[in-house]
């Protein structure tokens, strides 16, 4: 191989490396985007569970088909009430337990994606729907353990909150007593000043 051919081959390899580098970069960005989208989806599902008590149980979430059916059967009504500001969640509050369906999604999403799925959410819902009770048991067990963890952490959290509230009430009461004492002292001083003034005027 001549020097010119080696140079040409080297340039080709450099170009290929640049193309591969760009492809890898695009793939990484795609993975980040998919992770972000999946995270947002999970947050929406968890928010729905928190808002609807019927979903906060061991039963799976409704499928996309049921959502579509619900949208078709129920007319949309615009709420006339003012939207209330959502109370900010205490960052120290324990994380709510993840139900069995979301655990299944979390543990199987990568496998579904690697199989070339075009709609991971739909395929996860279908996969869960096709599981029998025996196959769902491990996810229910994990949910049960996570729920016990949540209950224990909430007990500790509520005790801390109670102690903080008690300390705040104590400080507030002490401040009120202090203010009352200062007010009483001021009144006594004013009354004495009035008496002294009356004595001077009488003399």
From Swiss-Prot:
SMART domains: HMG
CDD domains: HMG-box_NHP10-like
Source taxon at top rank: Eukaryota
GO MF term (any one): DNA end binding
Feature: DNA-binding region: 94-158
Subcellular location(s) of the protein: Nucleus
Job of this protein: Probably involved in transcription regulation via its interaction with the INO80 complex, a chromatin remodeling complex.
Assembly and binders: Component of the chromatin-remodeling INO80 complex, at least composed of ARP4, ARP5, ARP8, RVB1, RVB2, TAF14, NHP10, IES1, IES3, IES4, IES6, ACT1, IES2, IES5 and INO80.
UniProt-recorded name of the protein: Non-histone protein 10
Native organism taxonomy: Eukaryota, Fungi, Dikarya, Ascomycota, Saccharomycotina
């Amino acid at each position: 191989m001549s020097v010119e051919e080696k140079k040409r081959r080297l340039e080709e390899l450099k170009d290929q490396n640049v193309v591969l580098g760009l492809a890898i970069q695009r793939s990484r960005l795609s993975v980040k985007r998919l992770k972000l989208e999946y995270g947002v989806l999970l947050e929406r599902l968890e928010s729905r569970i928190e808002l609807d008590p019927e979903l906060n149980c061991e039963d799976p979430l409704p499928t996309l088909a049921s959502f579509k059916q619900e949208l078709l059967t129920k007319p949309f009504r615009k709420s006339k009430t003012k939207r209330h500001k959502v109370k900010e969640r205490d960052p120290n509050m324990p994380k709510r337990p993840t139900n069995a369906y979301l655990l299944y999604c979390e543990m199987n999403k990568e496998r579904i994606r690697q199989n070339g799925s075009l709609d991971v959410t739909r395929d996860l819902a279908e996969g869960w729907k096709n599981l029998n009770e025996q196959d769902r048991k491990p996810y229910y067990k994990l949910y049960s353990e996570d729920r016990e963890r949540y209950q224990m952490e909430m007990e500790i959290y509520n005790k801390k909150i109670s102690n903080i509230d008690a300390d705040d009430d104590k400080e507030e009461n002490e401040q009120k007593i202090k203010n009352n004492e200062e007010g009483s002292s001021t009144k006594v001083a004013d009354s004495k000043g009035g008496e002294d003034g009356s004595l001077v005027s009488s003399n």
